[in-house]
Amino acid sequence: MDGTSTDTSAQQAEGRTVDIAGIMRAIPHRYPFLLIDRVVELVPNVSAIGVKNVSVNESFFQGHFPGHPVMPGVLIIESMAQTAAVLVVETLGPEEAGKVVYFMSVEGAKFRRPVVPGDVLRIHVAKERNRGNVWKFNAVARVDGVAVAEATYAAMIMDKKAGEG
């Protein structure tokens, strides 16, 4: 290199961030079902890391379980799906606005340890492949660097139906 060129692959590898406003533009989920607070690293068409600050005030803790609050595993999987949906929308770009990401399948879901109030869930999602409008992902959720859940899942990217928000 002669020192004048730009190394775009290094810039892409650094990724970018998406705040809560960007997440809410990208996906339709809202309280109490919006399960990511920010995306701290996103490399379009490759991977994303979402963050969920798990608060004792989460509505699901009222019944899961009183006196021993544990985040339901299916909601950890949903946080993985929401992180992947932001990755898809950021990859497709604004020209594809109006698309919705629907779960198709979940494989090999494993839950390694409970997620409790005060935990910061870091959701690492990597695109395995996509063919047409079907995308497949691998994900691992971690707390303090320790894996708490993992799954492989597929999603279909579709147009919003008329009348859908």
Swiss-Prot record:
Record-listed E.C. numbers: 4.2.1.59
Signal peptide residue numbers: none
Source organism superkingdom: Bacteria
Main localisation: cytoplasm
Any one GO MF annotation of this record: (3R)-hydroxyacyl-[acyl-carrier-protein] dehydratase activity
SUPFAM superfamilies cross-referenced by the UniProt entry: Thioesterase/thiol ester dehydrase-isomerase (SSF54637)
Upper classification of the organism: Bacteria, Pseudomonadati, Pseudomonadota, Alphaproteobacteria, Acetobacterales
Primary role: Involved in unsaturated fatty acids biosynthesis. Catalyzes the dehydration of short chain beta-hydroxyacyl-ACPs and long chain saturated and unsaturated beta-hydroxyacyl-ACPs.
Any one of the GO CC terms: cytoplasm
Compartments where found: Cytoplasm
Record-annotated active site: 64
Protein family: Belongs to the thioester dehydratase family. FabZ subfamily.
Alphabetical list of NCBIfam families matching this protein: fabZ, PRK00006.1
Keywords of the record: Cytoplasm, Lipid A biosynthesis, Lipid biosynthesis, Lipid metabolism, Lyase
GO biological process: fatty acid biosynthetic process; lipid A biosynthetic process
Catalytic activity, reaction form: a (3R)-hydroxyacyl-[ACP] = a (2E)-enoyl-[ACP] + H2O
Pfam families found in the cross-reference section: FabA
Gene name of the record: fabZ
Source organism per UniProt: Acidiphilium cryptum (strain JF-5)
Descriptive protein name: 3-hydroxyacyl-[acyl-carrier-protein] dehydratase FabZ
InterPro entries: FabA_FabZ, FabZ, HotDog_dom_sf
